[in-house]
Swiss-Prot record:
Entry EC no(s): 2.7.1.24
Organism: Sodalis glossinidius (strain morsitans)
Pathway: Cofactor biosynthesis; coenzyme A biosynthesis; CoA from (R)-pantothenate: step 5/5
NCBIfam families, per the entry: dephospho-CoA kinase
Protein name: Dephospho-CoA kinase
Domain DPCK, first and last residues per copy: 5-201
Compartment(s) where it occurs, according to its Swiss-Prot or TrEMBL record: Cytoplasm
Residue ranges that the Swiss-Prot or TrEMBL entry lists as coiled coil: none
Binding site for ATP: 13-18
Length: 208
């Protein structure tokens, strides 16, 4: 049976984690691209050794883990090095993602992918759910959460697709500019919809 996949995406500071955790509280399994990206560069991993071999020991924190800030700074202004890093990590992330998607045992799985549209991955999902907020709210939330400057947030936003492009790819949208309980209600409604869609897809699988 093919796993029914709902892809959750949204710009930085939109509240993807809040929405994902609300689905998880309803028993929906999560496959989180950011978590997988951290797992493939754990201490002693082949990928981390390759990064240190290429960029030097300054890429390591005191505890032996990857210093993400140092790596970001190293590749930010060097497209060739960024291409090398993506070539190393993307196949590992993709393999781990596919394994987790296939092994999920539930009517549907929530696949959390911040750069879903940017990497043109939306075709892998049965349904695309976008968490949406206005730009100023994104900036304010990210500054508050990460302790970064407005300029840094705007640079990140510039590397992401536009709000309009993301919304154009959405099957469903959660407006995360309101009260937390509004998110809970909206997720509960979508959960029932996805259960019905997954059940329908399963019936079609069996009849074909």
């Amino acid at each position: 049976m093919t796993q029914y996949i709902v892809a959750l995406t949204g710009g930085i500071g939109s509240g993807k984690s809040t929405v994902a955790n609300t689905f998880a509280a309803l028993g929906v399994p999560l496959v989180d691209a950011d978590v997988i990206a951290r797992e493939v560069v754990q201490p002693e991993s082949a990928a981390l050794r390759a990064i240190v071999q290429r960029f030097g020991p300054a890429m390591l924190s005191a505890d032996g883990s990857l210093d993400r800030a140092a790596l970001r700074a190293r590749i930010f202004s060097d497209p060739a090095e960024k291409t090398w890093l993506n070539g190393l990590l993307h196949p590992l992330i993709q393999r781990q993602t596919e394994q987790q998607l296939r092994s999920a045992r539930a009517p549907y799985v929530l696949w959390v992918v911040p750069m879903l549209i940017e990497n043109n991955l939306q075709q892998r999902a049965n349904r695309v759910l976008v968490v949406d907020v206005d730009r100023e709210r994104q900036i304010a939330r990210t500054i508050s959460r990460d302790g970064v400057s407005r300029e840094q947030v705007e640079n990140i936003l510039a590397a992401q697709v536009s709000r309009q492009r993301r919304l154009a790819c959405a099957d469903d949208i959660i407006d995360n500019s309101g009260r937390p309980e509004e998110i809970t209600d909206r997720v509960a409604t979508l959960h029932q919809r996805y259960l019905a869609l997954a059940a329908s897809a399963t019936r079609q699988d069996k009849s074909s």
